[in-house]
Amino acid sequence: MIGRLSGVLLEKNPPQLLVDCNGVGYEVNVPMSTFYNLPGLGDKVVLLTHLTVREDAHILFGFGTNEERNVFKQLVKITGIGARTALSILSGMSVADLAQAITMQEAGRLTKIPGIGKKTAERLLLELKGKLGADLGVAGAVATDATSDILNALLALGYSDKEAMLALKQVPAGTGVSDGIKLALKSLSKA
């Protein structure tokens, strides 16, 4: 298995990269979250990898973080979710957002990802329930009822998922709903 690549970034054609490792060029497929954080062409890059071996191809997938790679491995274990679909899921939302959607059983958030229909989203919720978070080291994946209410309030006020999640991280655990909303709004006004 190839677990890690360290080399020079030669080409970037989303979602594929070409990485030169001591004269050998590796084609690596990466999620868009990793793609956006890549250095420029000709610069050194380090990727954590997962090799998928099929009858007709060996495909290398690369990730910027261990969390992404672990979630990818969990996703490809699910019936009906192949490596390309798993890559699409990780391109469509961050690991933290995915963990939040799974924890809160929000199939609607998952169906916004291209290639994920209602049945696939429900299968993801069922198969991954309780597996994301502690097992994968995703901080804050388990939401309390208050956290859920605060998040829903921020979304109802028109904030994006990303903005709401960032604001939610500023709210201490155990904070009540009304105080949590006030703290979250205060952190959003500073941004």
Curated annotation (Swiss-Prot):
Cellular compartments annotated: Cytoplasm
Flexible linker, as annotated region: 137-141
GO molecular function, one term: four-way junction DNA binding
Region (Domain II): 65-137
Residue ranges, annotated region (Domain I): 1-64
Major subcellular site: cytoplasm
Entry-linked SMART domains: HhH1
GO cellular component, one term: Holliday junction helicase complex
Keywords, in A-Z order: Cytoplasm, DNA damage, DNA recombination, DNA repair, DNA-binding
Keyword Lyase: no
UniProt keyword annotation of Hydrolase present: no
A Pfam match: HHH_5
Family: Belongs to the RuvA family.
Functional note: The RuvA-RuvB-RuvC complex processes Holliday junction (HJ) DNA during genetic recombination and DNA repair, while the RuvA-RuvB complex plays an important role in the rescue of blocked DNA replication forks via replication fork reversal (RFR). RuvA specifically binds to HJ cruciform DNA, conferring on it an open structure. The RuvB hexamer acts as an ATP-dependent pump, pulling dsDNA into and through the RuvAB complex. HJ branch migration allows RuvC to scan DNA until it finds its consensus sequence, where it cleaves and resolves the cruciform DNA.
Record's subunit section: Homotetramer. Forms an RuvA(8)-RuvB(12)-Holliday junction (HJ) complex. HJ DNA is sandwiched between 2 RuvA tetramers; dsDNA enters through RuvA and exits via RuvB. An RuvB hexamer assembles on each DNA strand where it exits the tetramer. Each RuvB hexamer is contacted by two RuvA subunits (via domain III) on 2 adjacent RuvB subunits; this complex drives branch migration. In the full resolvosome a probable DNA-RuvA(4)-RuvB(12)-RuvC(2) complex forms which resolves the HJ.
Protein name: Holliday junction branch migration complex subunit RuvA
Species for this entry: Janthinobacterium sp. (strain Marseille)
Lineage, top ranks: Bacteria, Pseudomonadati, Pseudomonadota, Betaproteobacteria, Burkholderiales
Recorded name of the encoding gene: ruvA
